[in-house]
Amino acid sequence: AMEIYSEPWFRTRLDYYLRERHPQLQYRAQLLDRRSAVAADLYRRTCDAGGSAECALRLADRSLFRGLLFSKFDTIDLILANDFPDIPEDQRRTVARALLTPCEPIFAGYALGDDFASRPEFRQLKAELRLGIRQWIDDNGPPGYEAKLRHRVRTRKMRNGEPRKTNRNK
């Protein structure tokens, strides 16, 4: 018996994928509706034309996830995991999501696509993101949580309830 994959099944898969890999897109109902309908239709038509369920699912998935295979969020999360070990693992996704907007100008300098992570420019993008994230954290503190280090620095600036003058302002 051949599996029959319906529109709600494709929608659930895409919704989960967006939550995990593209949290900034997860509530785009129009994207979920359109992609899941097209994938379900493509799956059904391929099976009706005599294609195997495996082939039909592969075609439907290609349609469902087109343009979403490269994830800015995953890239930032990877950099945080590798280069910013002070950020607790349980808070890394929150920090990565908060860094999407400040990192957008860096991403804008590249022609991103589904195969981008396998292209040579990916290494350059990661290097630029590392520098950009380091600069952003140096200027603003880590987004999404109260870092212990930042808290200690702030506490040291207080004397007798009065802020001490610092050379932090450039």
Residue ranges of each PLM-predicted region?
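C-terminal alpha-helical interaction appendages
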Residues: 1-170
